[in-house]
A protein has these predicted regions:
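Active-site-proximal loop/helix of nucleotide/amide-processing enzymes and allied scaffolds
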Residues: 1-9, 30, 48-50, 64-142
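Alpha-helix N-cap recognition
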Residues: 19-23
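Short Pro/Gly-enriched beta-strand edge/turn motifs at strand-loop
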Residues: 24-30
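Short loop/turn motifs at secondary-structure junctions and domain boundaries
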Residues: 35-38
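Short loop/turn microsegments at loop-to-beta-strand junctions
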Residues: 41-43, 122
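Glycine-rich phosphate/pyrophosphate-binding loop shared by adenosine-nucleotide-utilizing enzymes
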Residues: 54
């Protein structure tokens, strides 16, 4: 039984070139739905060398206050999709887009691990139930 599956972007699903954190958060936000207000969840968006979307995966779902992200699962999906870049994203149901020290530590750990595989962690984004978000790349925290 598979807990989570890689979602290939279908031919009728628009492939987009992601060049900014705002474009990334808008693209990823569509996968959350109403649960963004209740559960903390984590997704990864996989991109090719031209920063075009090639797939996404929900890698974790927790409770109101947190979720566990296993870097090995992130690496597995990145490798399986042959992605050149990954954007990691999770939400804060509280509505506070500020990264916690744990968010920053996890993002740096993901970046280091993916770099060993020649895969770039392009950003780590925190979404809220409103349109607010934080990009660790924009903050220089990656």
């Amino acid at each position: 039984m598979k807990l989570f599956e890689l979602k290939k972007i279908q031919s009728d699903f628009p492939t987009e070139k992601i060049t900014t954190s705002n474009e990334a958060q808008l693209f990823i936000r569509q996968f959350y739905g109403d649960d963004i207000e209740v559960f903390e969840s984590a997704f990864i968006l996989m991109l090719n060398r031209q920063n075009q979307t090639i797939g996404y995966a929900k890698i974790s779902q927790g409770g109101i206050a947190g979720t566990y992200v296993d870097p090995k699962i992130v690496a597995k999906y990145a490798i399986d999709s042959l992605s050149s870049g990954v954007i990691f994203c999770h939400n804060h149901p509280s509505g506070n887009p500020a990264p916690s020290p744990e968010d920053i530590t996890l993002s740096k750990k993901l970046k280091q691990g993916l770099n060993l595989l020649d895969i770039n962690l392009l950003d780590s984004i925190i979404l809220t139930p409103t349109s607010a978000y934080t990009s660790l790349a924009d903050l220089g925290q990656l």
